[in-house]
UniProtKB/Swiss-Prot annotation:
Annotated organism of origin: Homo sapiens (Human)
Entry GO MF terms: RNA binding
Disordered: annotated segments: 23-69, 353-406
Annotated InterPro entries: SCG3
PANTHER family to which the protein is assigned, alphabetical: SECRETOGRANIN III (PTHR17388), SECRETOGRANIN-3 (PTHR17388:SF2)
Protein's recorded name: Secretogranin-3
Length: 468
């Protein structure tokens, strides 16, 4: 009885204690109620949803021990957090770059990958769209890159077809920007292209000699550049004014003229500019003898050299366009008259219809045609020697008669003297002969480096002006 009474009292004391909640328990319940009533952050809700989803997808393995269950739960929680961060980053990237999103959508769109209708056209070569990142066509048909020699020929052909040296500059600048070639390689490429271009023009000149009726690409391009009815000196002045501001046109003309001189296509029909020099043009028309063909080539070569010289002086501001026109007018009159007096006897008879006959005939005019032609051929083949002989005999006293080259040198000297006297602005420094010589020497050396002139040709031009 004593033991039972003691146990009853213990039960009475314990049960009331378990029936009433602890102070901490009431605090947990109120906190739980407060958490239910308050709105939790969206990120926490998303994390819990992802965690529940992962738990359903990957149920934890039934292994004994509470520690195993806690490890799996932690692993799943880490996966859920990682997935959540990944989704959040993707959403931020989509908001920050809508354009990238558009591009991604287009990549997914299968219709964007379809070929154009032109790709299925059998009449198209397909080269226009085959290498869209290669507009210069530096690939073969099978897609393999061209060799260095093929590229040189391709560039030269493009320059020849378009008659524009700017084509080479564009291609080289692109290769330099891409880092495919160096500066030294660019200079080497320029020399090689100039050599191939010279061969192309020589080949075209030979074809033209075989079939004169077949128009060359150069004459076709030049046909539409000069109007039929233009005042001669007005057209020259307009050309000088344009050449002063257009460097591309000047470079193209210089390149073309230099290559033409080297290939010796000296027909006056290929030099439309000469028709604006009436005296000189009439002189050329009067020379139609086959024996005088060499002399005719010499006249055209030197006249073109002088025209280019005037263009360069105007372009670089040495003289104004108006002064250049006056210079060319004086050049046309003086050089034609002096050359007429140097022609052989049979040529003088033909020219007498266009020019008044001189009162006295020099010793050169009485020479035979055969002897004069032989001397002219010798003088033309050695332009350097003729200039040296002229310098060594300033008085003009020589046992042999002067040739046409020396006559032109004399005309150049008189034109320079005339140019110095007709200084409208009174600034004689612009016409200083030493400055002119330096300018011509620099230009000739620059053209040699660019492949526009041969070294021998440049030396001959420099000797012409150094003898002034």
């Amino acid at each position: 009885m004593g033991f039972l009474g003691t146990g009853t009292w213990i039960l009475v004391l314990v049960l009331p204690i378990q029936a009433f909640p602890k102070p901490g328990g009431s605090q947990d319940k109120s906190l739980h109620n407060r958490e239910l009533s308050a709105e939790r952050p969206l990120n926490e809700q998303i994390a819990e949803a992802e965690e529940d989803k992962i738990k359903k997808t990957y149920p934890p393995e039934n292994k004994p021990g509470q520690s195993n269950y806690s490890f799996v739960d932690n692993l799943n929680l880490l996966k859920a957090i990682t997935e959540k961060e990944k989704i959040e980053k993707e959403r931020q990237s989509i908001r920050s770059s809508p354009l990238d999103n558009k591009l991604n959508v287009e990549d997914v769109d299968s219709t964007k990958n379809r070929k154009l209708i032109d790709d299925y056209d059998s009449t198209k070569s397909g080269l226009d769209h085959k290498f869209q990142d290669d507009p210069d066509g530096l690939h073969q048909l099978d897609g393999t890159p061209l060799t260095a020699e093929d590229i040189v020929h391709k560039i030269a052909a493009r320059i020849y077809e378009e008659n524009d040296r700017a084509v080479f500059d564009k291609i080289v600048s692109k290769l330099l920007n891409l880092g495919l070639i160096t500066e030294s390689q660019a200079h080497t490429l320029e020399d090689e292209v100039a050599e191939v271009l010279q061969k192309l023009i020589s080949k075209e000149a030979n074809n033209y000699e075989e079939d004169p009726n077949k128009p060359t690409s150069w004459t076709e391009n030049q046909a539409g550049k000069i109007p039929e009815k233009v005042t001669p000196m007005a057209a020259i002045q307009d050309g000088l004014a344009k050449g002063e501001n257009d460097e591309t046109v000047s470079n193209t003309l210089t390149l073309t003229n230099g290559l033409e001189r080297r290939t010796k296509t000296y027909s006056e029909d290929n030099f439309e500019e000469l028709q604006y020099f009436p005296n000189f043009y009439a002189l050329l028309k009067s020379i139609d003898s086959e024996k005088e063909a060499k002399e005719k080539e010499t006249l055209i070569t030197i006249m073109k050299t002088l025209i280019d010289f005037v263009k360069m002086m105007v372009k670089y501001g040495t003289i104004s366009p108006e002064e250049g026109v006056s210079y060319l007018e004086n050049l046309d009159e003086m050089i034609a008259l002096q050359t007429k007096n140097k022609l052989e006897k049979n040529a003088t008879d033909n020219i007498s219809k266009l020019f008044p006959a001189p009162s006295e005939k020099s010793h050169e005019e009485t020479d035979s045609t055969k002897e004069e032609a032989a001397k002219m051929e010798k003088e033309y083949g050695s332009l350097k020697d003729s200039t040296k002989d002229d310098n060594s005999n300033p008085g003009g006293k020589t046992d042999e008669p002067k040739g046409k080259t020396e006559a032109y040198l004399e005309a150049i000297r008189k034109n320079i003297e005339w140019l110095k006297k007709h200084d409208k602005k009174g600034n004689k420094e612009d016409y200083d002969l030493s400055k002119m010589r330096d300018f011509i020497n620099k230009q000739a050396d620059a053209y040699v480096e660019k492949g526009i002139l041969d070294k021998e040709e440049a030396e001959a031009i420099k000797r012409i002006y150094s003898s002034l």
